[in-house]
Amino acid sequence: MIQIGKIFAGRYRIVKQIGRGGMADVYLAKDLILDGEEVAVKVLRTNYQTDPIAVARFQREARAMADLDHPHIVRITDIGEEDGQQYLAMEYVAGLDLKRYIKEHYPLSNEEAVRIMGQILLAMRLAHTRGIVHRDLKPQNILLTPDGTAKVTDFGIAVAFAETSLTQTNSMLGSVHYLSPEQARGSKATVQSDIYAMGIIFYEMLTGHIPYDGDSAVTIALQHFQNPLPSVIAENSSVPQALENVIIKATAKKLTNRYRSVSEMYVDLSSSLSYNRRNESKLIFDETSKADTKTLPKVSQSTLTSIPKVQAQTEHKSIKNPSQAVTEETYQPQAPKKHRFKMRYLILLASLVLVAASLIWILSRTPATIAIPDVAGQTVAEAKATLKKANFEIGEEKTEASEKVEEGRIIRTDPGAGTGRKEGTKINLVVSSGKQSFQISNYVGRKSSDVIAELKEKKVPDNLIKIEEEESNESEAGTVLKQSLPEGTTYDLSKATQIVLTVAKKATTIQLGNYIGRNSTEVISELKQKKVPENLIKIEEEESSESEPGTIMKQSPGAGTTYDVSKPTQIVLTVAKKVTSVAMPSYIGSSLEFTKNNLIQIVGIKEANIEVVEVTTAPAGSVEGMVVEQSPRAGEKVDLNKTRVKISIYKPKTTSATP
């Protein structure tokens, strides 16, 4: 274990331990090189550092994740070894794993479950494109950021399609609750194995639990390739059949029945909540024969309740005691056949006479009493026709919100279906006005007109949809930039909550930035992107020995100025250029050494352009070796590349002694 507060690998200050896996520990750390950015550091535990298989598996994860750059995959920032310890650093996701999220937020709405699964599929599409099978997909290996973004992690047992397994039992690595049937049989994991695991994860999101469980790994594994998948709709009636069909196909036991790619599953998932799939039949597979698929017809509630219970009881009794065809209780001696026929005929005739007499007596005294038909789920027109056919009158129509019954269809009658009423009784209809609530989607980046139409379709009144415009140079006019209610919010139509959409409009003004010190090419490009006409961007060059050539030294107008692009004015940028001429300093009275050094190092004159001559005459007070003349003179302009500088040094004549 790494000590808290220690600086690991020369850059990571360990804050705390946040995880402990089968082979590695995970720490929250601050990256000192990246200004204290929080990262997760995963370190292979000491007892595995000398295990070549463990090290290979750890390095496999590092390589696999480093090769996958995707917004829905945890990003690797560093891989290395410190004091013999294998480690990798990755982005820190400050949220929950999907397992815990399901536990704390179940039930998840259909929309949220589809959104999360869609993000997981996009991540795995990249992995599969790169030839990588995860092989350990489970909710614990999917992290959710505070804004609900899903990120896949822990590619610790991922394997490339073409690579050889690490060990003979390698194909059985992974969590058995999400293990595909082919893996449970010991076959090699494939892309379709990951798809199966995602199907089980999706099942868990919509039901709150895993489909197969048991006392041992063997028991659970057997269920994966022997037991049919329990019905999602049986546990969560809000799930439409099209959505359950996605899970059924993803978890098909035969590979030929399962999705062949995550792209195929993603396309099917994307339309699973659409209106045109609302009446989809349940998808089933024959997992034992060559037949690929069958379709079960939809069964209505009335069909279910009409199945004779006596038959079920009889069958149950015959199965329970099949050897006893006739019991002592059921046995009766039988009369001769001729007498039996005569007796039955007389009894039947008497019964018919009695029934006829009773009917005549009842009908002559009371109006007919009829059971009200069940019209739930029918349109208003269909329900009225059904009731009129049964000799009922139509009463009042009332509307009521319903999460299950489609708008415009009957929820129930008043009095209720099956109730006995006289002919001509007025039957009231309770009609669905649609869902009382819905999940707010992510509208950012979409056209505001499309979003408004969608909200109106969901019965949000016009006066509750507020549009606020905001100038934008980055987004197309009419695009939604912000929304007041975040994605995933449950919107209750009865509470009349306002929805504010901030929509981009073409910018007419911009704020000029501080361009001093920046490269002129970048600034010109930025101004052009903000619709400043190129002919109004004026560049003035000025020699500078202090600034890099091309660097902006002055600007007009200044930083912070509001600039109207609809009425553009000139912007002047003063840009540094390399110094080519300077004013000649005065070196009269200086030494030769000082003068040359200053000309070369400070002024920038090349040594080859400096000429030194000696003169024997000089002003009074001159000292030998002193500069007494210079050309050019002090203050004159000197071209650093062309001008030759002449320096005259005083050297007095030597006089010889008289003999």
Swiss-Prot record:
Keyword check for Nuclease, yes or no: no
Stretches in topological domain Cytoplasmic: 1-342
Q: What is the reported phenotype of gene knockout?
A: According to PubMed:22211696, cells lacking this gene show round shape (the cell shape of wild-type strain is ovoid) and form long chains with unsplit cross-wall joining cells. Their septa either are not positioned at the equator, or display an aberrant ultrastructure (curly aspects). They display delocalized sites of peptidoglycan synthesis. According to PubMed:22431591, cells in which StkP is depleted clearly show an elongated phenotype, with cell-wall synthesis occurring along the peripheral side between the septal zones. Reduces transcription of the peptidoglycan hydrolase pcsB gene.
Q: Which GO terms describe its biological process?
A: division septum assembly; regulation of cell shape; signal transduction
Free-text comment on this protein's domains from its UniProt entry: Consists of an N-terminal kinase domain, a transmembrane domain, and a C-terminal domain containing four repeats of the PASTA signature sequence (Penicillin-binding protein and Ser/Thr protein kinase associated domain). The PASTA domain binds to peptidoglycan (PGN) subunits (shown in strain Rx / Cp1015), is essential for StkP activation and substrate phosphorylation, and is required for cellular targeting to midcell.
Where does this one sit in the cell? Cell membrane
- Where in the numbering of this chain does the PASTA domain appear? 366-433, 434-505, 506-577, 578-651
**Reactions mediated catalytically:** L-seryl-[protein] + ATP = O-phospho-L-seryl-[protein] + ADP + H(+); L-threonyl-[protein] + ATP = O-phospho-L-threonyl-[protein] + ADP + H(+)
Which residue ranges does UniProt annotate as crossing the membrane? 343-363
What keywords sit in the KW lines? ATP-binding, Cell cycle, Cell division, Cell membrane, Cell shape, Kinase, Membrane, Nucleotide-binding, Phosphoprotein, Repeat, Septation, Serine/threonine-protein kinase, Transferase, Transmembrane, Transmembrane helix
Q: Subunit structure, briefly?
A: Homodimer. StkP forms dimers through its transmembrane and extracellular domains. Dimer formation likely promotes autophosphorylation activity and might be necessary for targeting StkP substrate. Interacts with MreC in the elongasome. May interact with sensor histidine kinase WalK, thereby playing a role in signal transduction by WalK.
Query: What GO cellular component entries does it have?
Result: plasma membrane
Q: Which residues lie on this side of the membrane: Extracellular?
A: 364-659
Q: Which organism is it from?
A: Streptococcus pneumoniae (strain ATCC BAA-255 / R6)
The record's active-site residues are: D136 (proton acceptor)
Q: Name the residues that bind ATP.
A: I18, G19, R20, G21, G22, M23, A24, D25, V26, K42
As recorded in Swiss-Prot or TrEMBL, the protein's gene is named stkP
Any Pfam family matching the protein: Pkinase
Q: EC no.?
A: 2.7.11.1
Q: How is it modified after translation?
A: Autophosphorylation occurs predominantly at the threonine residue and weakly at the serine residue. Dephosphorylated by PhpP.
SMART domains in the record: PASTA, S_TKc
Q: What is this protein called?
A: Serine/threonine-protein kinase StkP
